[in-house]
From Swiss-Prot:
Function field: Catalyzes the conversion of dethiobiotin (DTB) to biotin by the insertion of a sulfur atom into dethiobiotin via a radical-based mechanism.
Name this polypeptide is given: Biotin synthase
Residues that, per the record, bind [4Fe-4S] cluster: C66, C70, C73
GO biological process, one term: biotin biosynthetic process
Binding site for [2Fe-2S] cluster: C110, C143, C203, R273
Family: Belongs to the radical SAM superfamily. Biotin synthase family.
HAMAP family named among the record's database cross-references: BioB
Residues annotated as domain Radical SAM core: 51-278
Organism: Nocardioides sp. (strain ATCC BAA-499 / JS614)
Molecular-function GO terms, alphabetical: 2 iron, 2 sulfur cluster binding; 4 iron, 4 sulfur cluster binding; biotin synthase activity; iron ion binding
Length: 374
């Protein structure tokens, strides 16, 4: 017997669009209907992406000391979270960190820096890093995430070989001013539009669990669709101690899967990435969520530790997913290296699915002398 979610998938596969009412229905589906929701959304995922999963790797080029006051962010002005703080990594350090992620199975490297936005000198610095990385790894995709862009900066990044630019809208316009006061929603939209106009693939997503309503989640998602985001990272709030969002837990694993499924129904042909908070909030439903989403980050995040990279790859393999681009990697890399379990078990430092809900502060990889979780 077909469910209403099957009928919605049929309509979308026939060329129709999900409406805001459809999105709300998915978001508010009864928990007992979760597998029906996933099965229907999964049809859309497989129609566009098959069983592949894109693996991305973050390199935090500059950590902490940001002048913006985003309430959710451990790097923001006023945050007391005990995160790693450091200035720009050298090109050598960036190549080392990116190489670890690529050897671990990633095909896209995301070069991220804290701050309101880059100076022209910062753009030159990142452009040089991108050129060096492309020289060493010609097939790598590079996404830059440097904050609000000024006129002409996106074009310079594109000319240097950067493929994509990430700048999340984070939440609905109607909710934006409750989470940050130092920049506006329109500032964020302007940067996404600048990136797209320069030929950079626009990557923009949201953070769930910021006190938004169901309607505001839907509002944010349709805004991302209207902006033409090629990739939508869906983050789940990590409530760091020392931030205004500390001790804020509004999400359940089922709720997170419903949010991802809603995103798939509204944006059936878009890369949907399970981003920050995956391990903390999805817990044992991580693999189920990948039947709806088709992209993850490998290993650690900007300031928090993620699941052990070996566990990420084992999860993909055990559930029959194929890592996008893995067929192009030479023998002995990616999953083979992880099966051998050769690297970096850090005692007490690795987050696993189902662990305690407090974010584990990143103490390895970029900005440290400890090997990366990749």
């Amino acid at each position: 017997m077909q469910t209403s979610f099957d009928h919605l998938a049929d309509r979308i596969l026939a060329g129709g669009d999900a409406t805001p009412a459809d999105a709300l229905a998915v978001l508010r589906a009864d928990e007992k209907d979760l597998l029906h929701v996933v099965a229907a959304a999964g049809r859309l995922r497989r129609a566009r992406f098959g069983n592949t999963v894109k693996v991305n790797y973050l390199v935090n080029l500059k950590s902490g000391l940001c002048p913006e006051d985003c309430h959710y962010c451990s790097q923001a002005l006023g945050s007391r979270a005990p995160i790693l703080k450091y200035n720009w990594l050298s090109s050598e350090e960036v190549l080392e960190q990116a190489g670890a992620g690529l050897r671990g199975g990633a095909t896209r490297v995301c070069l991220v820096s804290s701050g309101r936005g880059p100076s022209d000198r910062d753009v030159d610095r990142v452009a040089a890093m991108a050129q060096e990385l492309k020289g060493e790894q010609p097939g790598v995709e590079i996404c830059a995430c440097l904050g609000l862009l000024k006129d002409g900066q996106a074009e310079r990044l594109r000319a240097a070989g950067v493929d994509a630019y990430n700048h999340n809208i984070n939440t609905a316009e109607s909710h934006h001013d409750t989470i940050v006061s130092t920049h506006s929603y329109s500032d964020r939209v302007d940067t996404i539009e600048k990136a797209a106009a320069a030929g950079l693939s626009p990557c923009s997503g949201l953070i769930a669990g910021l006190g938004e309503t169901d309607e505001q989640l839907v509002e944010a998602l349709f805004a991302l669709k209207a902006l033409g985001a090629d990739s939508i990272p869906v983050n789940f709030l990590m409530p760091f101690d020392g931030t205004p969002s500390e001790r804020t837990f509004e999400l359940t694993p089922i709720r997170c899967v419903q949010i991802l499924a809603m995103t798939r129904f509204v944006c059936p042909d878009t890369e949907i990435r399970i981003a920050g908070g995956r391990e903390m909030h999805l817990r044992s439903l991580q693999a189920l969520a990948l039947h709806v989403a088709n992209s993850i980050f490998l290993g650690d995040y900007l300031t928090s530790e993620g699941q052990d990279a070996r566990a990420d790859l084992e999860m993909l393999r055990d559930n029959g997913f194929a890592i996008l681009g893995a067929e192009a990697k030479p023998a002995g890399t990616a999953t083979a290296a992880h099966r051998a379990q050769t690297a970096h078990d850090i005692a007490g430092g690795t987050s696993v699915a189902g662990s305690a809900p407090d974010p584990a502060i990143r103490r390895r990889g970029a900005g440290t002398d400890v090997p990366a979780n990749a």
